[in-house]
Amino acid sequence: LYLRNENPLSLPPQPVEELEMEEIEAIREIAVSPVVLELSNQMQSLMKHSKSFTNPQYSLQEFLNDLNTNENRLNKALHYDGFSGFRDYINFYRLQYFKEQAQLKRELTVKELMFLSGFTSRSSFYRYFASVEKMSPSEYMEMLNREN
């Protein structure tokens, strides 16, 4: 039994003995079922293979249709994976894609990479990027350039 809280793709399971009481309660509330676990795997596979998140118009309804599920089950799977909702989940993948493309396509600007990744609002992108990476996108690009 563990709580995934940030990047569900890279965090190892946390032993129950190390969890805070609030985290244990959160796990119980989610009531993870095999359906939720399978949906979580389907979501990750869909994002990895289809890259639907790069479409700025990709909607919750399209996501539900792609997964052939309902909003209640989706929310349980999102919370199980440590996300607050659909937007948080999509933005997570967009940010990972931005970072991946920034390394591969160094000739592109932050703005071009932002649009390529599916973000449409510069201010929302910068705010989200800074909240996750603890630096601005420009600082991130400078860091990449210094590394090479």
Where is each model-derived feature located?
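Membrane-proximal linker segments that couple transmembrane helices to downstream signaling/catalytic modules
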Residues: L3-S117, S124, Y128-S131, M135-N148
